[in-house]
């Protein structure tokens, strides 16, 4: 891609890096003026990532592997760093991994945020992060063959059926609370579960000593599906289905990645329409989570009222695109449908109604003593832990970090729409609730401005050519935090590689630190403050570290106890 060097960001950071590590950078390739990929010597990979992360205000929302043996004879690992200091840009650190040894030095001991990504690279590609502290599988099940790695370009024999796993558990749940408690798991399936997943709380009486969890029991294989079965624009509609609430955010991130790779100029009106729908999605998600927060503290009147107002955000989506879910609008290069004057006026009317409704509900919420009593000082995310693990969204902003991609790396029309960045310093559940409250009002103001100031341009750029093996990042500040996608185009009208990273993926690793020192009855509220997919936590094992006993209970029972605080499930 031709990039005007005079407007390139990150040059000062790269110059400092080259001075600090002479000869470390082997290659440098610009994707956009704000994005650059550097290939570094593999033995210096941890040093380079650590230097950018801590010395230049970098954050690590995503890392991934790629099988590039047909391109250069190697595997590759990519660490995408969002640089959020004085010079804001994206620096992607790439290292080539020998195809025979498959070893690369783990970054996790230097930057803990890399832990889940490196575990996934090992599972999906068979690469070996030497020095990785957590050697457990992340994605693959225990009975998956050791020599089969799904995202390699090798031919897969889909007829293979592995031998059944034994009744004995092979996955070690970790308790860092200095206890030799024995764990007796049952499951992970349970009749009350919406979806498989296993969540463990290690407790001493009612107090949580530690927590561990295993997810990925139902892995949809969307990245492999995109690479093998779908054309470029078909993946746009697949990305819509990544999440049931913020699917539009994923489709914007995906299309943005391809547009950045090809240098496509998206019409301004399409940018504005994308921003409008992204804020409608934020309203939907935040109002849902605020309602659930009411439910978890036993304030079900607030729960029902917030869900009543949330319905208006779905009516808004139906007005704008014909569906209560924001599906099917994006294409590479723009959008498929316009917002007409009548729809715009009706939406503005709904915005005014929602502002009045939400103001009344928030006043009622903050006047409810139980809300502050149950949320202040609970589930604290320590600033040091937050800095080390790169969580995202309201979770990180509730711990005092001013991080939001709409401000740090404006995309769509966010460079033109007035907006406010809200942070709270408490680090607790209450702070995260308040971030969502403030952002709800700001989304309404942004919608009003965007609907009143829609540019008169086309909706779609057409006539561009796809370039094999061009690649770039695309990103969105979804309601839960950063959705970051990376796409490399192929030479057969399909993607060579698609990395799709959702916000909750970045937030899971810090949850165990937020649960420690709190009580069992606070667990649903703390977990809910992340705004994760609840089906991931529908099964809980409680392990009493004093009595060395474990008890498996439905998540709904923990939720019930968190609301009424009677009849402890531990007894």
Task: Walk through the language-model features, giving the residues of each.
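Terminal low-complexity/charged segments
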Residues: 1-210, 367, 371-373, 387, ...
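Metal/cofactor-centered catalytic core regions of large enzymes
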Residues: 42-45, 112, 138-571
């Amino acid at each position: 891609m031709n990039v005007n060097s005079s407007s390139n960001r990150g040059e000062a950071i790269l110059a400092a890096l080259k001075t600090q590590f002479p000869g470390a950078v082997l290659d440098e390739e610009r994707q956009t003026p704000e994005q650059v990929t550097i290939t570094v010597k593999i033995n210096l990979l941890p040093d380079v990532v650590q230097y950018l992360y801590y010395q230049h205000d970098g954050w690590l929302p995503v890392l991934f592997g790629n099988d590039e043996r047909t391109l250069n004879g190697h595997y590759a690992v990519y660490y995408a760093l969002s640089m959020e200091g004085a010079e804001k840009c994206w620096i992607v650190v790439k290292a080539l991994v020998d195809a025979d040894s498959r070893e690369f030095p783990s970054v996790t001991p230097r930057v803990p945020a890399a832990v889940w990504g490196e575990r996934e690279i090992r599972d999906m590609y068979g690469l070996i992060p030497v020095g990785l502290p957590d050697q457990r599988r992340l994605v693959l099940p225990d009975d998956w063959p050791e020599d089969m790695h799904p995202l390699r370009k090798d031919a897969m024999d889909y007829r293979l059926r592995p031998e059944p796993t034994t009744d004995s558990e092979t996955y070690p749940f970790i308790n860092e609370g200095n206890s030799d408690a024995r764990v007796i798991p049952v499951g992970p399936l349970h009749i009350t579960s919406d979806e498989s997943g296993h969540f463990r709380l290690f407790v001493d009486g009612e107090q949580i000593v530690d927590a561990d969890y295993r997810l990925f029991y139902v892995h949809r294989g969307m990245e492999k599906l995109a690479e093998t079965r779908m054309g470029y624009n078909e993946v746009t509609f697949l990305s819509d289905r990544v999440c049931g609430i913020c699917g539009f955010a994923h489709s914007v991130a995906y299309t943005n990645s391809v547009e950045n790779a090809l240098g496509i100029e998206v019409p301004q009106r399409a940018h504005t329409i994308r921003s409008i729908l992204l804020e409608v999605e934020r309203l939907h998600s935040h109002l849902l989570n605020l309602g659930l927060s009411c439910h978890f503290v036993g304030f079900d009147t607030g729960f029902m009222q917030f869900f009543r107002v949330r319905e208006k955000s779905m009516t808004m989506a139906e007005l704008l695109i014909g569906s209560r879910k924001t599906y099917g609008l994006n294409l590479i290069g723009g959008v498929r449908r316009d917002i007409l004057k009548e729809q715009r006026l009706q939406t503005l009317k709904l915005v005014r109604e929602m502002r009045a409704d939400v103001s009344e509900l928030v006043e009622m919420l903050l006047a409810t003593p139980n809300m502050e009593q149950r949320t202040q000082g609970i589930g604290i995310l320590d600033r040091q832990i937050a800095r080390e693990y790169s969580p995202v969204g309201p979770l990180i902003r509730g711990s005092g970090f001013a991080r939001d991609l709409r401000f740090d790396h404006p995309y769509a029309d966010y460079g033109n729409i007035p907006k406010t960045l809200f942070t709270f310093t408490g680090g607790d559940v209450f702070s995260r609730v308040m971030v969502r409250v403030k952002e709800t009002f700001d989304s309404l103001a942004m919608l009003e401005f965007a609907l009143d100031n829609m540019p008169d341009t086309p909706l779609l750029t057409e006539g561009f050519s796809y370039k094999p093996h061009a690649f770039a990042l695309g990103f969105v500040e979804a309601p839960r935090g950063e959705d970051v996608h990376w796409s490399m185009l192929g030479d057969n009208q399909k993607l060579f590689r698609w990395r799709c990273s959702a916000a909750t993926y970045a937030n899971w690793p810090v949850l165990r630190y937020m649960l420690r020192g709190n009580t069992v009855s606070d667990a649903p509220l703390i977990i809910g403050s992340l705004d994760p997919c609840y089906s991931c936590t529908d099964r809980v094992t409680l392990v009493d570290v004093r009595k060395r006993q474990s008890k498996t209970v439905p998540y709904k029972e923990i939720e019930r106890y968190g609301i009424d605080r009677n009849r402890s499930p531990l007894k």
